[in-house]
Amino acid sequence: MIYTLTFNPSLDYLIQVDDFEEGKLNRTCREKVFAGGKGINVSIMLNNLHHESVALGFIADFTGRQISSLLQQRGISCRFIEVKEGMSRINVKMRSGVETEINGIGPNITSSDVDKLFGELSKLDDGDMLVISGSVPKTLPDDMYEQIMCLVKDKNIKVVVDATQDLLVNVLHLHPFLIKPNNFELSEIFGVDITTKEDVIYYAKKLQEKGAVNVLVSMGASGAVLVDETGCVHTSPSPSGVLVNSVGAGDSMVAGFMSGYLESSGDYSHAFLKGIASGSASAFSVDFATNDQIENILHSMQE
């Protein structure tokens, strides 16, 4: 089974306001509410790719219940920890020429809540996969990623980490199965300017030397690079298409990679290409890409 962990899920409220005027009454002309968070995005994409997953994390109050309900409507299993104090955050994304975002805070997660999460994680079995992604709320310890990886390290669990800076660097010694920085995040980690594919490959190998098993680096319109556990380097340009929505493209890439890895019994070349196809298909779509959209792009990449 695949498990995804989102520490601070959100109820995302996307609104379109034509000719927004600050300080005056404005009316929306289009609106949509959906469950948000990096791990949740991975679960949604896995579902689109016909893979089951279980969404873990913390929710609170009516907004949290709505997050769970929206996922269950998609057929995604949820085992969220219900927090007593506060409410799951609402993130407002307003489009009016430019996009403005206002993110909520989230609930007050206690040590007792963390213990309950650890209880859920202790139920994972050998052969399961766990995706840990996104930021850690201020009410949680900074080393949450490390604590979780230490908790499952004695089991044969493939842990995927999609995080930035110290959250990522501090778990490399625990040998995550897959990490997925983008080229800008790679630059931040090493404090250098990374401008070429050769630079990306060099520093991806540096992360591998620090303990990562597989390093997948997304480079936006410039494509992607994978340095797999055998030392083989895979590169690919980005498929051609019109960028519609970049939100969730990286999470879609993670889901696509996992899907490709599982369905090919560990073929990294196929996993890499399906990851790119999934990320690109979502970037070219208003919503997360469908399996058919992904397969069409994957087929064009393999011709």
Region spans (language model):
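Conserved phosphate-binding/catalytic region of the ribokinase-like
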Residues: 197-303
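Charged helix-capping and loop-helix junction motifs
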Residues: 115-118, 142-149, 195-201, 236-241
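Conserved phosphate-binding/catalytic loop of the ribokinase/pfkB sugar-kinase fold
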Residues: 83, 93-126
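Gly/Ala-rich phosphate-binding loop of Rossmann-like dinucleotide-binding domains
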Residues: 47, 153, 262
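Short beta-strands and strand-loop turn motifs
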Residues: 101-103, 128-134, 162, 180-185
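Substrate-binding N-lobe of the ribokinase-like
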Residues: 27-87
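Positively charged, low-complexity intrinsically disordered leader regions
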Residues: 1-23
